[in-house]
Regions:
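Conserved beta-loop-beta/alpha segment of the NTase-like Rossmann-fold superfamily
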Residues: 88, 94-157, 176
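Conserved alpha/beta core of the MobA/IspD/sugar-nucleotide pyrophosphorylase nucleotidyltransferase superfamily
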Residues: 174-233
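Acidic helix N-cap motif at the loop->helix transition within catalytic regions
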Residues: 71-77
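Short, low-complexity intrinsically disordered segments enriched in A/P/G/S/L with frequent Arg
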Residues: 4-9
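Short helix-capping segments at alpha-helix termini
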Residues: 55-57, 79-85, 109-110
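N-terminal glycine-rich phosphate-binding loop and ensuing alpha1 helix
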Residues: 13-71
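Short, flexible, basic/aromatic active-site loop/helix in glycosyltransferases
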Residues: 155-181
Length: 233
C-alpha cells in the first residue's frame, strides 16, 4: 500500500503503534487466524486498532500481517471503520522479530525521542490507560512493557526437568504487550541482533524486551497490565 507514516516534525515526538497480525493461531483449532475471529460482533484485531486509533497520544499505526490478509485488513478494518491512523500495512516476516522489524522499517526517519509501541493484535483488551502509561514510561526509561504479577509458583528447571530454582513470586511477572521503546534504541538493538545472527548467534528471541536486553544492554521497566490482556490463544 502507498500509505505513508508522517515524519518527525521539529521537536514534536511522534508516537507510532506497530500492531502485529501475522500469526496463524496454530494453538487454536480454527481454520481462521485468531486475530480475525469474531468476538462480540467484531474481529479480534478490530479492538486493538480501535484502542490505538482513538488514543490522542498515538500519531500513527503500522499494521503487520500476512500477504494474503493485506486486502482484508485494508478494506474490512482500516477503511470500514475509518481508522485514520492506520498509515501503512506491511507484510510480516518469518519470525515475530522479523515482522516487528518490517513495521519498524516502515516508520522511516525518526526523531531521537520518537516512541514506538509494539502490540500483539490477538490481545484485544488493551486500554487507553495502559497505552498512556507505556508512552510515559518509555519516554522516561527508554524501554518498558506491560505485565502482570505471576499468580502461579514458577520453577526454573534444567535440561532433565529437575527444578533448580524457585524465584520469589513477587519478583515474577508474566509479560504482555504493548512493549514500548524509544525508536532509535529499538532500531539499534535490531541492527545488532541481525549482525549477531549473521555471525552465527542462535539465541531464541521471543519478544522485544528480550531483544533490547540482549542486544542493547537496556533493562525494561514493567508497567502494570491486566489478566484480561492475555492472548486469546
Amino acid at each position: 500500500t502507498e500509505m505513508l507514516v508522517p515524519q518527525s516534525r521539529g521537536t514534536q515526538i511522534m508516537v507510532t503503534a506497530i500492531v502485529l497480525a501475522a500469526g496463524v493461531g496454530s494453538r487454536m483449532k480454527s481454520e481462521k487466524a485468531k486475530q480475525f475471529l469474531e468476538v462480540a460482533g467484531h474481529e479480534v484485531l478490530y479492538y486493538s486498532l480501535r484502542a490505538f486509533d482513538e488514543h490522542p497520544g498515538v500519531d500513527s499505526i503500522v499494521l503487520v500481517t500476512k500477504e494474503e490478509f493485506v486486502e482484508h485488513c485494508q478494506k474490512e478494518l482500516a477503511e470500514r471503520y475509518q481508522f485514520a491512523k492506520v498509515r501503512d500495512i506491511c507484510i510480516g516476516g518469518k519470525e515475530r522479530y522479523d515482522s516487528v522489524y518490517q513495521g519498524l522499517s516502515a516508520i522511516g526517519a525518526e526523531g531521537e525521542n520518537d516512541i514506538v509501541l509494539i502490540h500483539d493484535g490477538a490481545r484485544p483488551f488493551v486500554t487507553a490507560e495502559m497505552i498512556s502509561a507505556s508512552i510515559a514510561c518509555a519516554r522516561e526509561c527508554g524501554a518498558c512493557t506491560v505485565g502482570v504479577p505471576a499468580k502461579d509458583t514458577i520453577k526454573i528447571v534444567d535440561t532433565d526437568h529437575y527444578g533448580v530454582e524457585t524465584p520469589e513470586r513477587k519478583f515474577v511477572y508474566q509479560i504482555q504487550t504493548p512493549q514500548t521503546f524509544q525508536v532509535p534504541l529499538l532500531r539499534r538493538a535490531y541492527e545488532t541482533m541481525y549482525e549477531a545472527k549473521r555471525n552465527g548467534d542462535t539465541h531464541n528471541i521471543t519478544d522485544d524486551t528480550m531483544l533490547v536486553e540482549q542486544y542493547a544492554g537496556v533493562r525494561c521497566k514493567v508497567v502494570e497490565g491486566a489478566a484480561s490482556l492475555k492472548d486469546i490463544l
